[in-house]
C-alpha cells in the first residue's frame, strides 16, 4: 500500500501529484487515445503581446492572482490583450482537487489581510469598468472565504464607484447560511456559481461537491437579493448527454438563474479527465435556443465560452461565442 502524500503548507500540487490525492479513483490508469482537436478549436494568438505582459506585471507587482493563468484558460491571450482579467482571491491553492481543473491543490496559506485594498488599487490603475472576482475553494476557513469576498467588494467600490462587480463563488460547503449572511451587505452586481456538469458526473468530475447544494446556494442568494441576477456555467465534453444538459438548464431556471454559460471542456494535461468529445458549434447554437426558450435572459454558448469570458458583454446580453 503506497504511503499518502504529506502536503506541505503553501506548496502547489499539480497534475499527477494532484490527481494522486483524489480519494475516488475514477480515471483509467492508462490514458486512452487523446482526441484530436477539430478546426473550430484552433486559437489565433494576438500579434502584439505587450498588453498581456503589462497585465501580468501588474499582477506580480501587487502579488495578485488571475484564474486565467492559474487555471490555464485558453482565452488568456485574447482577454489579456483586451485589458481584461478575472482576479482570483484567497490565494492560488485550492482545498479541492477536481480532476478537470488546473488550479493547484494543497494546504493554503492564511488569507492576506491587505488583498482587498491591493485588488481595489490594481483595478483602479487598470481603469476597469467591469470586473470578475473568483476564488479557490477554502474549506479550511470557517466562513469559506465569504468575509474576504465582502471585503473585496467593499474596497473595490470605494475606489471605483462606477464599477460593476461579478463574483464567481465556490459552494461554501457546510457553511452556506453563514457565507450568505456575511456577504449580504456587500453583494455583487452579478452572482455566479458554476454547476460545471450534469449530476451523474459529479462523483467523477467534482469530488466533494453536491449538485443540489449548489442549486440551493443560487436559490438562497436570489431570495435575499431579488434584484441581482444569478448566473451559472457548464462544461461540455465530459461524457454528458444533450438531454442531461437540458435537464440541468431546467433545474437552473427553477432556482431563479437567468444567466448561462456553456463551453467546451479542454483537458489541461494528460493527468486530467480526458475530453470525451468535441461539441460542434451548431450544438451550442441549439442549446442556446433551448436556454432562451426556457427563460434565460442571457445565454453565452460556444466552444471557447468560459464563465468570465467577455463577462461585461455577457451582462449586456451581447452575442458571445
UniProtKB/Swiss-Prot annotation:
The keyword Cytoplasm applies. Binds 2 [4Fe-4S] clusters per subunit. One cluster is coordinated with 3 cysteines and an exchangeable S-adenosyl-L-methionine. It is found in: Cytoplasm. One of its GO terms (cellular component) is cytoplasm. Residues 80-297 form the Radical SAM core domain. It holds the Pfam family LIAS_N. InterPro entries: Aldolase_TIM, Elp3/MiaA/NifB-like_rSAM, LIAS_N, Lipoyl_synth, rSAM. Keywords: 4Fe-4S, Cytoplasm, Iron, Iron-sulfur, Metal-binding, S-adenosyl-L-methionine, Transferase. It is an enzyme of class 2 (transferase). The keyword Membrane does not apply. One of its GO terms (molecular function) is metal ion binding. [4Fe-4S] cluster 2 binds at residues 94, 98, 101. [4Fe-4S] cluster 1 binds at residues 68, 73, 79, 308. Its EC number is 2.8.1.8. Its cofactor is [4Fe-4S] cluster. Pathway: Protein modification; protein lipoylation via endogenous pathway; protein N(6)-(lipoyl)lysine from octanoyl-[acyl-carrier-protein]: step 2/2. It catalyses: [[Fe-S] cluster scaffold protein carrying a second [4Fe-4S](2+) cluster] + N(6)-octanoyl-L-lysyl-[protein] + 2 oxidized [2Fe-2S]-[ferredoxin] + 2 S-adenosyl-L-methionine + 4 H(+) = [[Fe-S] cluster scaffold protein] + N(6)-[(R)-dihydrolipoyl]-L-lysyl-[protein] + 4 Fe(3+) + 2 hydrogen sulfide + 2 5'-deoxyadenosine + 2 L-methionine + 2 reduced [2Fe-2S]-[ferredoxin]. PANTHER family: LIPOYL SYNTHASE, LIPOYL SYNTHASE, MITOCHONDRIAL. NCBIfam families: lipA, PRK05481.1, PRK12928.1. Belongs to the radical SAM superfamily. Lipoyl synthase family. This is Lipoyl synthase. It comes from Vibrio parahaemolyticus serotype O3:K6 (strain RIMD 2210633). The lineage of its organism: Bacteria, Pseudomonadati, Pseudomonadota, Gammaproteobacteria, Vibrionales.
